[in-house]
Structures are given as structure tokens and as C-alpha cells.
Amino acid sequence: VSPQTETLRARYAAAGLTQDAVARDPFAQFRQWLEQACAADLWEPNAMVLATAAWPESAGAAAADPDQLAAAAAPSQRSVLMKGFDARGFVFFTNHGSRKARQMARNAAVSALFPWYALHRQVLVEGVVERVDAVESRDYFHSRPRDAQLGAWASRQSEALASRRDLESRMARTTARFDGAEVPLPEFWGGYRIRPHRIEFWQGRTHRLHDRILYTRDAVAAGAGDGDARAGDGDVHAGDGDAGAGDGDAHAGDGDAGAGDGVGDARAGDDGFDAAGAWKISRLYP
């Protein structure tokens, strides 16, 4: 018997979220919530649902044909693991030949959702994605367990696979290929950074009167550089464990999201902008 979904209803009783109480910097606010998600022992608190969509080469023709538009430009989603963040954005890693990477190559606009259901919270990030530099990709790749490094070489992500046996055979050949040697960073694998212009924090409340606090990036202030809104000193990275989410292109860790220094308890100014003028804070109707 299927569940009666129309009657499934949760009770929300969490404390509120106000403009006066949140950090002026969304990355500092995110750090606080991530630490609380880790402390609550949520499963893979750094997992996020990444949404991407390509745009057809012939936009006019596709728009005239709904089926073609759906096939060429429909958004797709998958769970990936956020492996670090700082004032520049949120970093994840994947195969450059994967479906999401191909879509991002044609349309850099993405969104990511952190769904912390047990805490009645979610964080929605919208922005533009860019590749991280080779050094950052190499450093992270070599921090992964060796089996995960070999798996990145063995997987032709998003391509059709005849059987599980074929995948295991590729893994065996890859293991033999690098036996006794360091596993190099594949040229087809690396990191991406979401540079957000919009970050929304959602807190469930009673009577469906939920709290929604929105940070929006001011384009002029953002152009002045990345130093005007800091979440702390350095990146925050999840651990290097072996529990994969979604496509399996990134691996969760120990829940070891370390807090950086310098996160103050600053408040937004009367005009809604933070002191550097980079982020505007506003409240949305639920």
C-alpha cells in the first residue's frame, strides 16, 4: 500500500532565524550551521544536491520544439560532496567527462542545496561555477584513499556500462597499472568552485511560518575582490573517508569540517548590507 503523501506532515519547533541574529557574512553563517550539522551526527552533512542544465546550441529551434528543449536543456540533479569552502565559494570534484561537467561547460549557472532535514534546515546556493586550479585538484586527489584514486581512473563516468563485471575488470587493470607507484591526478578529473551570488538559509518553524534569510551579492562590491567578506582563515575541508554520495565522484570524510579562525559575531547594518558592502541580507515570505 502506498503511503498517503497528502497526510504526511512534519512538526517544526526549532528556534527562529532573524536578520539581526545571523552573521553578516553568509560563509560564516554557513560554517556555523555546518558545524551544528556535524555535531548532530547527520549522515554526510557536506552532501549537496547539485543542479545543472545545458543550453541547446540552437536555442531558437529548441524553444519551438518542447521535446527538443526538454532533451537538450532539461535540468538534472545529483548528490555530490562539498569538499571545501571559503569566501570564494564552495568546492567539489568530479570527472570532466561526466554529464554534469559537460552541462557546466555549456552553462556555468548552477545551484546547490544542502538538505539538513533532521535539523529542519536547508541552504540553497546559486551561482556560477569555475574550475579550480590544477594544484588544488592535485592536492585534494592525493589526500584521498588510494582505492578512491584508482576508482577515479577506472570510471568512465556517465558512459553506458555493460555490466558490473566490466567495471570491476577496469578497476583490476587500473590497480595493476599503478602497482607500487603513486597514482597521478587524471587529466580528466578535477575540482569546481561555485562562486555564489545568492545564498538562502531556510529554518522550519511552526504553522508553516518558516524563516527564510537571503544573502545576495552586490555585483559592484564583488568586483572589488574576494577579500571583502571572509569566513575565516583558509578553506574548510571535509575528511577523507570512503563513504560516497551520488555519482561517487567525491568521498565523504569523518565529518571533520574544521572551523577556521576569525569568525566573529558581526551583525548586518541598518541598510541591510554588511560592513564591506558585498552582501545584502533580507527576509523572504515562507
Identify the residue ranges that each predicted region occupies.
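Long, intrinsically disordered low-complexity tandem-repeat regions enriched in serine/threonine/proline
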Residues: V220-D270
